[in-house]
């Protein structure tokens, strides 16, 4: 369906209602999706997002309508959403551009002494990343949280910036969004999603120089168990993010 939509220049929203490998509890690869965003990245006119909160979806859908039916772009959107119940916060001020471009700072690190770390989460695992902040605070580590709505869009934009800089060496070099956002931050960077590690690893080449980057993901087969146990088994729960 994804490739057919690409070839036919279809427009619209393709919504996967069981985001990630731990949201719908089943077995194997068919019922626990840890790879659809890896596949969707191969379709050039498929714009993929893995949002967590309702306000993120609202911004993405609004922008999709503008691009597809206002600007008449031959693109379509792939959104993965959860069937899990959890509270949705109010939208942080000024985060719309970051939602559209693939990442924004959801929670700033608390001021104080001690080491600092940058935590990036997406989709079903963003809330595990939020929970990891509390665990790290108990160890004296301050953590900022970034919501990655689309690692694929971050990579695509960064590759285009890299290309333009190579083609126009006489002009001032542009900076990719992901590089710009993280350049003023401190400490190692840890990313966790409900997808294979290769998904979040897409941005590794575009991180600020000298930064350590570790990716947690759901490689392997799924299992029949609770979400809590699945996330522990696949090493993407709050404890694995923190420790």
Please describe what each predicted stretch is.
Residues 2-9, 208:
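Acidic (Asp/Glu)-rich catalytic clusters
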Residues 2-3, 30-38:
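Surface-exposed loop and adjacent secondary-structure segments within mature catalytic domains
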Residues 12-13, 18, 22-30, 41, ...:
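Thiamine diphosphate
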Residues 53:
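Ferredoxin-type iron-sulfur electron-transfer modules in oxidoreductases and energy-metabolism complexes
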Residues 1-5, 61-64:
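Buried hydrophobic packing segments
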């Amino acid at each position: 369906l994804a490739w057919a939509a690409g070839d036919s220049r279809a427009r619209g929203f393709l919504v996967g209602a069981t985001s990630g490998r731990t949201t719908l509890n089943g077995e194997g690869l068919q019922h626990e999706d840890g790879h659809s965003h890896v596949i969707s990245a191969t379709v050039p006119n498929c714009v993929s997002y893995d949002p967590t909160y309702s306000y993120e979806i609202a911004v993405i859908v609004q922008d999709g309508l503008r691009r597809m039916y206002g600007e008449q772009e031959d693109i379509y959107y792939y959104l993965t959403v959860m069937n899990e119940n959890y509270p949705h916060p109010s939208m942080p001020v000024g985060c719309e551009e970051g939602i559209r471009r693939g990442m924004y700072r959801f929670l700033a690190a608390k001021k104080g002494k001690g080491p600092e770390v940058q935590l990036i989460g997406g989709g079903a695992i963003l809330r595990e990343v939020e929970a990891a902040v509390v665990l790290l605070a108990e160890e004296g580590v301050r953590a900022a949280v970034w919501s990655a709505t689309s690692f694929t869009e971050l990579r695509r934009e960064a590759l285009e910036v890299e290309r333009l800089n190579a083609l126009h060496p006489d002009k001032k070099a542009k900076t990719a969004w992901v590089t710009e956002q993280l350049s003023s931050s401190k400490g190692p960077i840890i990313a966790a999603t409900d997808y294979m590690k290769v998904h979040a690893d897409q941005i590794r080449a575009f991180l600020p120089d000298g930064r350590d980057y570790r990716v947690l993901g759901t490689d392997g087969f799924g299992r029949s168990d609770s979400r809590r146990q699945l996330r522990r088994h696949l090493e993407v729960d709050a404890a694995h993010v923190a420790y």
